[in-house]
């Protein structure tokens, strides 16, 4: 029972995000959050006198510097720029990193790590993880994962944990899955151009990705347990090449999102010209009452690229009760429940809605469109 309560508590903390989140993709890529994995009391893997936390930070700073120099319209937010931790409790530390990303209204989250094999010095290569659960993991891959900070992963062998996590994974994938996978594929493509061994993209129930409300990846830049790769990822040349590969991936990703917004953006409605007034009508034509342009607040439960029937079974117990509103961007169809005069009242309804839709959050609507409201 205590274990279940702990999982539920983390789940609620993970969802305690800024209410204005959720429009990350629809607004384009304006804020990129770079997370240098580990830090402070959490060194990560250690081989040959080198600590993973330092390698991660050096690459993160190089990547951020490239974006800041060459992409002036994109803001870079770092979870850390020095050797520090946010809590001596690892789970709280991971949550703090996600909180930084969410509070910054991040549009893309990149977590940088290095790998290690507990039993093999020959294993090498690069891989990128996205939020999910793979049923095809080999025992070797699982050994690598759980030897390196098991606490960073949800234990999906526990049925209580798995049920909660899978529900949230489904919603994350529905909203951001396409974009996370696109970024992961770009990263692996640019790694491969360097001649690195491509270990591919893997779906894993990572706590830090679970708690971020935006497209997110965690990339493993090489194996510290392999002497050749350790030398490479610790060298200035190796770190610059890795940072450049990530930077080129970011550029392509930003272009991809921009293109998707242009394709998916709703076209302005063409209204027919009003019919001329009859000649015999002398008094001024009566004007219809103006529709209220007052902003109201509601709880968004789902977003989609295409229209969904409000009676769709995916809405569960809210089937037939949800309403549709439009927004700019790729996922322009938003579905919500309830209408409230102020944000506080809408936020009070969120806990109830999250029993069915764990990713639910508050949005503001004006004139039939989702608007940004602080």
Which ranges hold each PLM region?
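Sec-dependent signal peptide recognition
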Residues: 2-10
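Hydrophobic h-region of N-terminal signal peptides that target proteins for export
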Residues: 10-18
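Catalytic-core regions of hydrolytic enzymes
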Residues: 22-154, 177, 181, 240, ...
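Structural recognition of the beta-strand scaffold that forms the well-ordered cores
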Residues: 31-35, 75-80, 108-112, 127-130, ...
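Short, surface-exposed ligand-recognition loops at beta-strand->loop->(often short) alpha-helix junctions
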Residues: 56, 298-308
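Active-site-adjacent mobile loop/cap segments within catalytic or ligand-binding domains
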Residues: 166-261
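Short, highly charged C-terminal tails/helix-capping segments
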Residues: 259-280
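Extracytoplasmic
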Residues: 283-294, 305-374
């Amino acid at each position: 029972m205590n274990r279940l309560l702990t999982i539920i508590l983390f789940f609620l903390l993970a969802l305690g995000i800024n209410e204005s989140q959720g429009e990350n993709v629809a607004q384009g890529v304006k804020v990129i959050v770079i997370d240098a994995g580990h830090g402070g009391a959490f060194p990560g893997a250690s081989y040959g006198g080198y600590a993973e936390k330092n390698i991660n930070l050096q690459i993160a700073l190089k990547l951020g510097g490239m974006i800041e120099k060459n992409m002036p319209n994109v803001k870079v937010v770092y979870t850390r720029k020095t050797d520090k931790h946010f809590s001596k409790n690892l789970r709280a530390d991971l949550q703090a990193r996600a909180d930084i990303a969410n509070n910054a209204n991040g549009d893309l989250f990149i977590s940088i790590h290095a790998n290690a094999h507990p039993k093999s010095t020959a294993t090498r290569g690069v891989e990128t993880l996205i939020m999910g659960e793979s049923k095809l993991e080999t025992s070797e891959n699982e050994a690598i994962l759980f030897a390196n900070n098991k606490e960073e992963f949800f234990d999906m062998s526990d049925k209580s944990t798995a049920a909660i996590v899978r529900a949230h994974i489904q919603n994350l994938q529905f909203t951001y899955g396409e974009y996370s996978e696109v970024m992961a594929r770009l990263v692996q493509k640019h790694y491969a151009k360097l001649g690195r061994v491509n270990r591919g993209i893997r779906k894993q129930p990572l706590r830090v990705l679970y708690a971020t409300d935006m497209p997110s990846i965690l990339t493993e830049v090489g194996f510290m347990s392999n002497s050749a790769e350790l030398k490479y990822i610790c060298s200035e040349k190796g770190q610059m090449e890795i940072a450049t590969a990530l930077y080129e991936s970011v550029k392509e990703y930003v272009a991809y999102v921009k293109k998707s917004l242009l394709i998916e953006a709703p076209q302005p409605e063409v209204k027919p010209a009003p019919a001329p007034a009859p000649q015999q009508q002398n008094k001024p034509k009566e004007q219809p009452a103006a529709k209220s342009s007052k902003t109201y607040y509601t709880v968004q439960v789902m977003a989609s690229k295409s229209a969904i029937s409000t009676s769709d079974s995916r809405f569960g117990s809210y089937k037939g009760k949800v309403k549709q509103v439009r927004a700019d961007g790729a996922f322009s169809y938003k579905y919500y429940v309830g209408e409230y005069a102020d944000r506080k009242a809408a936020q009070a309804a969120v806990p109830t809605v999250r029993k069915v839709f764990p990713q639910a959050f508050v949005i503001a609507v004006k004139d039939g469109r989702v608007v940004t409201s602080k």
